[in-house]
């Protein structure tokens, strides 16, 4: 990088190469050295990343196709790591011309007049990445460029001179990676202009045709939903994008947990003072899995991985708020804290008509309930099967206590000691947990005691009501009778 003139650069035997060759050769080194070039991308090791590596080795332009929250843009940004750390360019060039292969009038003129004394500068790979979100208002001038009348007047040039062109984002991404997010949102006529650049290597601005063999690695991202809702990718352009790679959501709870743990932004105080058991972490992830197969949610829109990240952050913050209000120095996440993640869920799901009728909050609570029911069978016997077996039902004493008219409210106003006292009121609840999980800490035992109540409610053995900042548990049939009685009273009021 000490070289500052073209002559000095030539003396080092520097060889020019295209950005796609650069990516390919650096990827070959990475693969041979068994290094990781896409750090932080989890769950794609056997699917997306091998296909992406193949596309780079083939020197293809790439389309990443997938639902929202599948790391498409992040993958594109990480491709920068495969570029050389620094590359030389003709100093002063708007489009960072290669000193050994100039394409702009400015660079050619500089080299023609100054020869080996032409000044060169060095461009870091972080500056060789350009990203544009496709929106309906994007114009050809934004992407490709336009004639600049002020420049023409100032330099006293005619519109036939290429120096009057003000280059757009794509020419300025020469020798770089250029990413267009949500490609179908781009108007068809602008997509055609892109196709022309990919195919013919020239640009046309207001009738001015300029041969400009740009060296660009194009990466496009798109959501399959866009093909039917907002727009489509024009066929000639899609045909010129050589590799289409399908992304996907995490295929297991373990992978999903790793992503959430990596992306969730927690403070040092939250990490130190708030304990989150593996059960509640799994529940947060299971909620997303339930959402991805729910009849209330538009599956074409998808359920982003951001849902679990936001939900986990809210879960920790709900526990933190409870801790601060009660004046305690530390706490652990309870299942009742799941009431605090409802805003994170409702903001991340697109409902179909049936879901709109139910309401976002009701759909969110339904998803939480389904997640509890799915995981409950991994920790305890199925309550429905337990009733039919000849062996003693482990839940009989618990349900009978509620049948006698007792109830338990678990809200965010309870301190840790009050929380323990409320759960210990239920006979045999502690013994049931210890029977199946004898080696747990006190906090884990209390968590599973509450989990049993939630699980029995999901299996219709108990009634669960959403309270402000928590849940209330009571007898199933008693709550149904009270609900019917309240309805009769309401009818009497109107007679």
Regions found by a protein language model. Name each.
Residues 260, 284-288:
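Short alpha-helical scaffolding segments that buttress acidic/His motifs in well-ordered protein cores
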Residues 332-420:
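Extended alpha-helical coiled-coil/bundle linker/stalk regions that scaffold oligomerization
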Residues 31, 147, 291, 319-322, ...:
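Generic structural signal for hydrophobic core residues of well-folded globular domains
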Residues 2-254, 265-282, 295-299, 380-495:
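Conserved ASCE/P-loop NTPase catalytic core
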Residues 75-78, 83, 99-110, 225, ...:
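Hydrophobic transmembrane alpha-helix bundles
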Residues 270-277, 290-367:
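C-terminal helical "lid" subdomain and adjoining coupling/linker elements of P-loop NTPases
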